[in-house]
């Protein structure tokens, strides 16, 4: 397992340069104001441009009608607004949309999950992942690189552009963002934190801190740093009731065990208002691996000092994986044990699994029909060969 924590020291230049245009999607509001100051402009001009960028999803300076023509001309010489492009779109029968998004010569995946009262966007932070969780499709491709700020916030921008910008449609197209796509967000703090700042900024996407969630598998030093930098909702990928099982399925546990991880979680909760005093526990259900009633009792004892709600996640198969999905009856028994201890327990509804957009299935490449057929067979579903 390769692990390198990138700490938040912005390296993005904010000095205008005609030879190398600055992508304004790489800049948070503080950096935008510095950039405009270096252009000889007042700080409020940065705020105006940000509103056009994020409230209207505008990437054309000429369309920014409250910006004078001279400034628009200067901006075109030294800056651009360039979000990553969608190279393929897949739509699920349940309304979920998965976009394969080009980042340089590679791809990441972003998932849009609409519901009656909300619309959640699942965003990637890295190309691949270094943590090698055994049940996750992303981990099987290894780690390639961190995404830039523009490639992270650009996923939100691109999705909002497609489904309808807030000022264009009159309603918020994305109500929640979860950093639960490809990669471990805490291994890319340099870019993840400024991107989340833009999500929260009133001149950015203006989301409540309770509606931006970062999920981590347990990079403890970075989690301790996060609490001093930004306040967002926290979810943790626990997936096991003891170190023996977690060492096997979440290898970073060998470096930062459950006790150490939960200690860092409690420290974060002490600093955070976004979490309302409790963390979300993510627990993927693997058949006869971590889903027995004895495991549920162990989990309840383990979490008794950590205020939390628990999401039980039916595992989503992918070709070559050594696991099976827990039966509904085993998940139900597990859930009832946890509830008997007083834990708020939710069985997550699987969304987008017919397009490989469900939890643990994002792989970066556009999934081909052969892989999808193999996955369906693993689930015991009958495949109509004519539909493949």
Swiss-Prot record:
Its cofactor is [4Fe-4S] cluster. Keywords: 4Fe-4S, Cytoplasm, Disulfide bond, Iron, Iron-sulfur, Metal-binding, Methyltransferase, rRNA processing, S-adenosyl-L-methionine, Transferase, tRNA processing. Its EC number is 2.1.1.192. Pfam families: Radical_SAM (PF04055), RlmN_N (PF21016). Transmembrane segments: none annotated. GO terms for molecular function: 4 iron, 4 sulfur cluster binding; metal ion binding; rRNA (adenine(2503)-C2-)-methyltransferase activity; rRNA binding; tRNA (adenine(37)-C2)-methyltransferase activity; tRNA binding. One of its GO terms (cellular component) is cytoplasm. S-adenosyl-L-methionine binds at residues 183-184, 215, 237-239, 316. Residues 115-354 form the Radical SAM core domain. It catalyses: adenosine(2503) in 23S rRNA + 2 reduced [2Fe-2S]-[ferredoxin] + 2 S-adenosyl-L-methionine = 2-methyladenosine(2503) in 23S rRNA + 5'-deoxyadenosine + L-methionine + 2 oxidized [2Fe-2S]-[ferredoxin] + S-adenosyl-L-homocysteine; adenosine(37) in tRNA + 2 reduced [2Fe-2S]-[ferredoxin] + 2 S-adenosyl-L-methionine = 2-methyladenosine(37) in tRNA + 5'-deoxyadenosine + L-methionine + 2 oxidized [2Fe-2S]-[ferredoxin] + S-adenosyl-L-homocysteine. The active site is at 109 (proton acceptor), 359 (s-methylcysteine intermediate). It comes from the Bacteria. It is found in: Cytoplasm. Its main location: cytoplasm. [4Fe-4S] cluster binds at residues 129, 133, 136. Specifically methylates position 2 of adenine 2503 in 23S rRNA and position 2 of adenine 37 in tRNAs. m2A2503 modification seems to play a crucial role in the proofreading step occurring at the peptidyl transferase center and thus would serve to optimize ribosomal fidelity. Belongs to the radical SAM superfamily. RlmN family. This is Dual-specificity RNA methyltransferase RlmN. It comes from Salmonella typhimurium (strain LT2 / SGSC1412 / ATCC 700720). The lineage of its organism: Bacteria, Pseudomonadati, Pseudomonadota, Gammaproteobacteria, Enterobacterales. The gene is rlmN.
């Amino acid at each position: 397992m390769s692990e390198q924590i990138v700490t938040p020291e912005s390296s993005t230049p904010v000095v205008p340069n005609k030879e190398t245009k600055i992508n304004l999607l790489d800049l948070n509001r503080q950096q935008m104001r510095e950039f405009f100051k270096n252009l000889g402009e007042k700080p409020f001009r940065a705020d105006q441009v940000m509103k056009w960028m994020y409230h209207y999803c505008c990437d054309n300076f000429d369309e920014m009608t409250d910006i004078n023509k001279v400034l628009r001309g200067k901006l075109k010489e030294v800056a651009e607004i360039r979000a990553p492009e969608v190279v393929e779109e897949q739509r699920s029968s349940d309304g979920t949309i998965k976009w394969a998004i080009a980042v340089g010569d590679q791809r990441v995946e972003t998932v849009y999950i609409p519901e009656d009262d909300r619309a959640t966007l699942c965003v990637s932070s890295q190309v691949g992942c270094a943590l090698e969780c055994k049940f996750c499709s992303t981990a099987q491709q290894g780690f390639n690189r961190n995404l830039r700020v523009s490639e992270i916030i650009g996923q939100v921008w691109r999705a909002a552009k497609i489904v309808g910008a807030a000022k264009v449609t009159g309603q918020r197209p994305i109500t929640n963002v979860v950093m639960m796509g490809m990669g471990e967000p805490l291994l890319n703090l340099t870019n993840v934190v400024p991107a989340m700042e833009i999500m929260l900024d009133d001149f950015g996407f203006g989301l409540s801190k309770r509606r931006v969630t970062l999920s981590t598998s347990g990079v403890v030093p970075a989690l301790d740093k996060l609490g001093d930098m930004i306040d967002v909702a926290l979810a943790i990928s626990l997936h096991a009731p003891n170190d023996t099982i977690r060492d096997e399925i979440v290898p970073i546990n060998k470096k930062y065990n459950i006790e150490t991880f939960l200690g860092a979680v409690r420290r974060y909760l002490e600093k955070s208002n976004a979490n309302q005093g409790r963390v979300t526990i993510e627990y993927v259900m693997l058949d006869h691996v971590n889903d027995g009633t004895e495991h549920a009792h162990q989990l309840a004892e383990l979490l008794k000092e950590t205020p939390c709600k628990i999401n039980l996640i039916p595992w989503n198969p992918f070709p070559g994986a050594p696991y099976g999905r827990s039966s509904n009856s085993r998940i139900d028994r597990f859930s009832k044990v946890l509830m008997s201890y007083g834990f708020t327990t939710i069985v997550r509804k699987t969304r987008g699994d017919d397009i490989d957009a469900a939890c643990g299935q994002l792989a970066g490449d556009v999934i081909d029909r052969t892989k999808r057929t193999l996955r369906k067979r693993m689930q015991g579903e009958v495949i109509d060969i004519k539909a493949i």
